[in-house]
């Protein structure tokens, strides 16, 4: 019975938050370092290079996201410097700034480049990798019966990798390759779910760093019907 009420309470809270966003249009909110963050004002700017910039403002803060002007999912902290998220805070004349620029560090996400061949016996196996600027990255492979790798899960993040590094899964014919998408201290994802009547709706989450390597987390971000200005 207690479990039932806990699930029911969670569901009611979720519905309440969703309704709060939809009844306060436009809306942009999330959790900054596990504390609720809500913009007083939100707007979208359409840029000449085919991207948009979404800004959410409080009295002293700005959360900014720059992504292509199209429905889709976009990784942050990659080699593409034109796609990023940032957070700035102004206090007594000082500005504290965090951004999802590419950072050297433990791997956060990989993307398959070439499935290679000869890996049939390694489906579900954890393998070492070679290449890139770092070391220690291990992957659990998903492999077709014909020996072609179709994906992998990171089991050990390693150290000192850079976005854009190409690494090779050891085994088979040693020809299955992956790209390091982003690293642990600077990463994230923006999803534009809907563009409708000059407004944008979607989700955002990211880890961003300042010049000293300090990390800021922005999670559970939702923007709803934010208009173009």
Task: Show the residue positions of the predicted features.
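A short, structured loop/turn motif at beta-sheet edges
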Residues: 191-200, 227-229
């Amino acid at each position: 019975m207690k479990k039932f009420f806990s699930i029911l309470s969670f569901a009611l809270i979720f519905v309440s938050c969703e309704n709060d966003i939809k009844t306060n249009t436009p809306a942009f909110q999330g959790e900054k370092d596990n504390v609720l963050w809500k913009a007083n004002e939100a707007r979208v700017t359409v840029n000449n290079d085919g991207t948009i910039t979404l800004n959410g403002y409080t009295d002293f803060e700005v959360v900014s996201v720059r992504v292509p002007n199209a429905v889709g999912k976009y990784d942050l902290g990659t080699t593409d410097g034109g796609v990023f998220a940032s957070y700035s805070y102004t206090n007594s004349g000082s500005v504290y700034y965090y951004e999802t620029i590419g950072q050297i560090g433990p791997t956060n996400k990989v993307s398959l480049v070439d499935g290679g061949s000869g890996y049939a016996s390694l489906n579900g196996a954890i393998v070492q990798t070679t290449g890139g600027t770092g070391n220690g990255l291990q992957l659990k492979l998903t492999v077709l019966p014909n020996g072609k790798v179709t994906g992998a899960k990171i089991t050990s993040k390693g150290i000192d990798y850079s976005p854009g590094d190409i690494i090779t899964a050891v085994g088979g014919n040693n020809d299955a390759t992956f790209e390091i998408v982003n690293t642990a201290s600077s990463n994230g994802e923006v999803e534009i779910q809907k563009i409708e009547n000059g407004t944008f709706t979607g989700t955002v989450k990211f880890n961003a760093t300042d010049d000293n390597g300090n990390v800021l987390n922005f999670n559970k971000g939702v923007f709803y019907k934010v208009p173009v200005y």
